[in-house]
Design a protein with these regions (language model features):
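S-adenosylmethionine
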Residues: 206-309
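Nucleotide donor/acceptor-binding cores
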Residues: 70, 176-178, 266
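A structural signal for isolated positions on well-ordered beta-strands in alpha/beta enzyme cores
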Residues: 73, 100, 202, 226, ...
Length: 309
């Protein structure tokens, strides 16, 4: 079960005019990413409940360049985590931001975005939230996903691109032994791999809220797999397929470690990339001993499939 309380850290910009402030906001967002906050919300909470595209990562650009800066919100179950984050923000960005923490019930927080979470049908899977009880397609593998506080509901293009790449790889391989999902979020990709028949599946995430969400979804889907709170696993390599749906800011820093997890000749799927970042990502990957095999884009986002050289 999810914790009963959800906590909100709001980050308000004290000076909201001038192009230099937009640059500062991007710097702050990158700082959040570097601190492990890979997903957060821009704009008022009221707009979150009206706009189904509320899930915004640090690489997405501020849309209204001519207006004032919207606040940033970080949501966590762990109040102490947010208090530590606020202290670090105030230490690093004093006089430029104002931070505040408030609490609300998890039930009310989750009710706000339920209408925006719709079932997704892919080549092999039917992804749906637990509150939708419609008849499921007979020719698809059902996966029930409740996101909680974690990233990865199937609604975002990067998650769909990853899922499709996993399905395409499944159609071409007979090696279904070991699967690694780095930055597992809700566990959706790891669960899909287990449903396809992988013998051993490991999901990792640095976010404790993601581990809570993925554990619950694993139980809901009657799957057996390992979860580790952390980034790249130690002493677990190699894997037949490795997936990392994170963001470019992080991927370029860990690409060498990701490559080390992949069996020679096996595949690494990367997503969380903007289409404009793919060529630079390819350069980092090549230096890590990976060759680009395939690339797909959707809604300005991209997924890349690399083979370990």
């Amino acid at each position: 079960m999810h914790p009963t309380e959800t906590h909100q850290l709001s980050i308000e910009f004290t000076n909201s005019s001038g192009p230099q402030v937009l640059e500062f906001k991007e710097d702050l967002k990158n700082w959040l990413i570097g601190s492990g906050e890979e997903a957060f919300v821009e704009g008022a909470l009221d707009n979150l409940f009206e706009d189904p595209s509320y899930e915004i990562t640090a690489d997405e650009q501020f849309a209204d360049l001519g207006g004032g800066l919207q606040s940033i919100f970080v949501y966590k179950y762990d109040l102490e985590h947010l208090e530590r984050l606020r202290a670090e923000l105030e230490k690093n960005f004093a006089h430029q931001i104002k931070c505040d923490i408030t609490s609300l019930t998890t039930e009310s927080w989750m009710e706000g975005w339920k209408e925006s979470f719709k079932p997704i049908t892919s080549a092999r899977f039917y992804l749906y939230p637990p509150w939708i009880q419609d008849e499921k397609p007979a020719n698809r593998i059902p996966i029930v996903i409740e996101p909680g506080m974690a990233f990865g509901t199937g609604q975002h293009a990067t998650t769909v691109l990853c899922l499709e790449a996993i399905e395409q790889f499944f159609d071409k391989t007979t090696s279904l032994d070991r699967f690694l999902d780095v930055g597992t979020g809700t566990g959706i990709l790891a669960i899909a791999a287990k449903k396809l028949g992988y013998n051993y599946v490991l999901g990792t995430d640095i976010d404790s809220d993601a581990i809570i969400a993925s554990k619950e979804n694993i139980v809901q889907n009657n799957c057996k797999m390992d979860l580790v709170q952390g980034s790249i696993p130690v002493d677990q390599a190699p894997f037949d397929l490795v997936v990392a749906n994170i963001i470019f800011f992080v991927l370029k820093q860990i690409i060498g470690d990701l490559s080390a997890q992949v069996k020679p000749g096996a595949l690494l799927i990367l997503s969380g990339l903007l289409a404009e970042e793919t060529r630079e990502m390819e350069e980092y990957a090549l230096k890590a001993g990976l060759r680009l095999e395939k690339e797909e884009t959707r809604d300005d986002w991209a997924a890349q499939v690399y083979r370990k050289i």
